[in-house]
Amino acid sequence: MIWNEILCLGDSITFGARDCYGRSYPAELGKMLTEKTNEFYYCHNHGISGETSSDLLKRSWNNISSKSNSNIMLLMIGTNDTQKNIPEHIYEDNLRQIISIAYVHNMYVVVGTL
């Protein structure tokens, strides 16, 4: 069986804080991909509740470097930026920098939003 790793970065939505069944979207995604293919998928959940894009940027290099076997990064961040009135240009710059770090590590990047 082939082993695939996906790195999921984000805030409480990624972490799964509001799921009444204690499941996160990374766990469910890994399960669904494994069931639909002949390959095993593991999604590393690096979601932290309350985190902004600035917080995520500060830890991105270590998170991305430590998951060098992952070739896909899913990024969902921004809810807390909105709630904390972080200017849009700062949010956009943070996303660009996070994505650039992933590109340095030869990752495909998927940016999600709500």
How should these model regions be labeled?
Residues 31, 39, 55-114:
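Alpha-helical cap/lid subdomain in secreted, periplasmic
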Residues 1-49, 54, 59-69:
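Serine-esterase "nucleophile elbow" of acetyl-processing enzymes
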